[in-house]
Amino acid sequence: MARSIWKGPFVDGYLIKKVQKLMKSGKSEMIKTWSRRSTILPIFVGFTFSVHNGNKFIPVYINEEMVGRKLGEFAPTRTFHGHGADKKVKRK
């Protein structure tokens, strides 16, 4: 179910503070975060976030198409190694 519009998007407060601090300084550092649940805001465009996937940090560069989605959508938590091979001998 989608979030109510009257509530607005959820973003951890420290992420907004970090982005504003980087905007003032003019630096282009990676912002390290565990907050996969935070919504991407328009002020995040152009920044690179290191999003934790449970094992390591995945670099995610934010562009305009990502606005409104969650940070966790771009850092997959599971790796697919393929299905097991068929061990039965096929007869002709």
Swiss-Prot record:
Keywords: Ribonucleoprotein, Ribosomal protein, RNA-binding, rRNA-binding. The keyword Phosphoprotein does not apply. GO terms for biological process: ribosomal small subunit assembly; translation. GO terms for molecular function: rRNA binding; structural constituent of ribosome. GO terms for cellular component: cytoplasm; small ribosomal subunit. Protein S19 forms a complex with S13 that binds strongly to the 16S ribosomal RNA. This is Small ribosomal subunit protein uS19.
